Amino acid sequence: MLKTDVVVIGAGPAGSMAAKHAALGGANVVLIDKKSEIGTPKRCAEGVYDEGFKWLNIEPDERWIAQRIYGATLHSPDGNSFTVTSEDVPVQGFILERKVFDKHMAMDAARAGAKIMIKTLVTDIKRNENGFILSCDSIEGTIEVEAKIAICADGPESIMAKKLGINSTTPQNMMSCAQFEMCNVDYNDDEKIEFYLGQDVALKGYAWIFPKGNGVANVGLGVTGNTDKTAYEYIMDFIEKCPATKNAQPIEMNIGGDPINGLIEKIYDDNLLICGDAAGQVNPIEGGGIIEGMLGGMAAGDVAAKAIKEENYSKERLHEYYEKYSELSFNLIETLPAARDIVYSFTDDEYNKIISVANTIDLKNISKRDVLKVVFKLPPTLTTKLIKLLKIVFPKQMKSILF
């Protein structure tokens, strides 16, 4: 039997961050992943904002950056578009090469002192007097791992968390996603990501083209709600109709679920922490979860290491993880579901009006009050929705403007 202080299940970005920070904090750590190659297959559109890496104290590395991004274009259902650049809004980002990025994050965990076990499937986890016993199937046969603290980072609707009595099921708002990595994509600018809105494009969701340079891009979409069409059927229709993809050819396909419901009911318990997609640490509006999950992993690892030093693994001690994550994520994962519901209630006509009005704004010379003036030019029902949305997303700014 292998004995350790902390075991992390899943070597995605969140799990690797948890393992890294637990090891940096002095704990003995084992990081387990069921795949024979960390990072494959990729699970997302690979887009991140650069500010997130500053929060994580990670220096961007050209080896895992496919493309730097300096702007975004939103396409409305009627064919109009609105573009914002980093000159207008001080936000930049990257399109990652996840197969490289995930490996580097795992290597950082190893350099911090974590032991990595690949092609090892955790088949069962049970409590004992010391914490947990994990049963694992590996290439060397069946092995057992005993740990004082377990960190579940095993993806949406965590199987291991369920085995421990945690309700990790996403009851609703599981975004169904389909994506192709494609070549010969005719995008206008490889430094801008593109979003396509409309119920025919993606019901209660959106489609995206994330360029990776040299005509290569991730082309995908996510849908929510009740629909007779699958995400795969939606993406095939989109690729056929979108001018940018009419000559594109697929080189990889990814299909899966994205939990945009917000945090699960419980992300910690006695001897247990849950992070990443397993915890619902995903932006409820746009479905991004790389940075959000890594912040969760960093918080989980830090708290686990301190708990090991104190020899206190109770849920009362591990509650610090919840507080730390809420602080690091600005509590957005808990507040944004209400904003998501507003965004996904927009009709095609409302999207058309929003994009049309947005094009009247001079982003380089506009105040917060000017934004409200533009919003009030819209139909009353849409204005009400947007005011509610702005109050949720920018509560402090809206309070200072309105009161």
From Swiss-Prot:
Cofactor note: Binds 1 FAD per subunit.
Superkingdom of origin: Archaea
Matches recorded under SUPFAM superfamilies: FAD/NAD(P)-binding domain
GO terms, molecular function: flavin adenine dinucleotide binding; geranylgeranyl reductase activity; oxidoreductase activity, acting on the CH-CH group of donors, NAD or NADP as acceptor
Pathway membership: Membrane lipid metabolism; glycerophospholipid metabolism
Pfam families named in the record: FAD_oxidored, GGR_cat
Any further remark recorded for this protein: Reduction reaction proceeds via syn addition of hydrogen for double bonds.
Protein name: Digeranylgeranylglycerophospholipid reductase 1
Lineage: Archaea, Methanobacteriati, Methanobacteriota, Methanomada group, Methanobacteria
